[in-house]
Amino acid sequence: MKAYFYDNLPGDQRLPHDSGKEVTVAELEKVGVLYFRFPDVEGVNTLAAERGYKNRDEIIVSPEKMGAIYETKVRQFFDEHLHEDEEIRYIRDGAGYFDVRNEGDEWIRIKLVKDDLIILPAGIYHRFTTDDTNYIQAMRLFKEEPKWTPLNRTEGLDENPYRQEYVTQFLKAQAEQA
């Protein structure tokens, strides 16, 4: 895993866009993002039991697997959105980027590779893309039945109760500590 501020320069979303300003695991935790590295599935199973993740599936995002819809799907994943559930991904192969917003509404880019596991809290604005290899295989973990319902960032979404809870728990807490 490598985390840094996104450079916001134009160009292919699958390129690194590395500003050169590193972000630590502790800084990720301040915005509610949890990172783990598990060389085998046993560690994932233990975490799943501890956190109540009852269901899982696997997804491969690649042109070979997805065919003609690949480019459309990758652009869709890159639309800024939030979920009303935690988003948990364990990378089985390949690589990709999760971008998350910090308390200053800046993008933090998180590159994940094989054996990395990330947990994004409900209500965090984020987006995803593969890297320039155009391939990632990930295990998705869920507390309940598998679902992936993105709520794209629009005017008024900040009033969503899951967004409000996220802001209170993480962003306002940071502002009060500053």
UniProtKB/Swiss-Prot annotation:
Keywords, ordered alphabetically: Amino-acid biosynthesis, Cytoplasm, Dioxygenase, Iron, Metal-binding, Methionine biosynthesis, Nickel, Nucleus, Oxidoreductase
Annotated GO CC locations: cytoplasm; nucleus
The record's free-text note on cofactor binding: Binds either 1 Fe or Ni cation per monomer. Iron-binding promotes an acireductone dioxygenase reaction producing 2-keto-4-methylthiobutyrate, while nickel-binding promotes an acireductone dioxygenase reaction producing 3-(methylsulfanyl)propanoate.
SUPFAM superfamilies tied to this protein: RmlC-like cupins (SSF51182)
EC number: 1.13.11.54, 1.13.11.53
Subcellular location: Cytoplasm; Nucleus
Pfam families the UniProt entry points to: ARD
List of residues binding Ni(2+): H81, H83, E87, H126
GO molecular function: acireductone dioxygenase (Ni2+-requiring) activity; acireductone dioxygenase [iron(II)-requiring] activity; iron ion binding; nickel cation binding
Cofactor(s), names only, from the UniProt record: Fe(2+); Ni(2+)
CDD domains: cupin_ARD
Signal peptide bounds: none
GO biological process terms on file: L-methionine salvage from methylthioadenosine; methionine metabolic process
The keyword Chaperone is annotated on this UniProt entry: no
Pathway this chain belongs to: Amino-acid biosynthesis; L-methionine biosynthesis via salvage pathway; L-methionine from S-methyl-5-thio-alpha-D-ribose 1-phosphate: step 5/6
List of residues binding Fe(2+): H81, H83, E87, H126
Catalysis performed (reactions): 1,2-dihydroxy-5-(methylsulfanyl)pent-1-en-3-one + O2 = 4-methylsulfanyl-2-oxobutanoate + formate + 2 H(+); 1,2-dihydroxy-5-(methylsulfanyl)pent-1-en-3-one + O2 = 3-(methylsulfanyl)propanoate + CO + formate + 2 H(+)
Record function comment: Catalyzes 2 different reactions between oxygen and the acireductone 1,2-dihydroxy-3-keto-5-methylthiopentene (DHK-MTPene) depending upon the metal bound in the active site. Fe-containing acireductone dioxygenase (Fe-ARD) produces formate and 2-keto-4-methylthiobutyrate (KMTB), the alpha-ketoacid precursor of methionine in the methionine recycle pathway. Ni-containing acireductone dioxygenase (Ni-ARD) produces methylthiopropionate, carbon monoxide and formate, and does not lie on the methionine recycle pathway.
Family listed: Belongs to the acireductone dioxygenase (ARD) family.
Protein name: Acireductone dioxygenase
Name of encoding gene: adi1
